[in-house]
Amino acid sequence: LIKSPPASGKSRALMFIALDKLANQGIKQAIVVVPEKSIGASFNDEPLSKFGFWADWQVAPKWNLCNSPGTDGGKVKSVTAFLESSDQILVCTHATFRFAVEKIGVEAFDDRLIAVDEFHHVSASEDSILGKQLNDCIARDRVHVVAMTGSYFRGDAVPILVPENEAKF
């Protein structure tokens, strides 16, 4: 869980975490999930090695689905193609991720990092599709989840995750 105020470096912190997980922790791919397309720009290429890190954050243009034209249906096909590829980083919206999980199932994301920006948009409510999908992923214990938010609390009384999954953070 990365909880920090807006514009304080959560996206940059995730880049370091994801690159380490990809290189050293057996994770196949990193999927960054953002609430809207404009936030996807926070995850554009970054020359981290310029500042002493051992790798750079690089997202192939075709895998930053926030910058690509098309409908969610076409983007779901792109998510599927990404999962079948050897490329390592994908950026997409919450909606695209939800539709992809609905189509191909949570099992398709095994052994991957799922990083969810603006995590407070998730809810344990049965009405929250993204919340249910993330709870299912966490319950399978086959994915690494990084939650990023400025505030871990929602404005309503609904918890973000079910208690047994929240305890895993």
What is the predicted role of each segment?
Residues 1-17:
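Walker A/P-loop
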Residues 11-13, 22, 26-56, 96:
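Conserved Walker A/P-loop ATP-binding site and its immediately adjacent core
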Residues 53-99:
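Inter-Walker segment of RecA-like/P-loop motor cores
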Residues 94-96, 105-147, 151-152:
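SF2 helicase catalytic motif II
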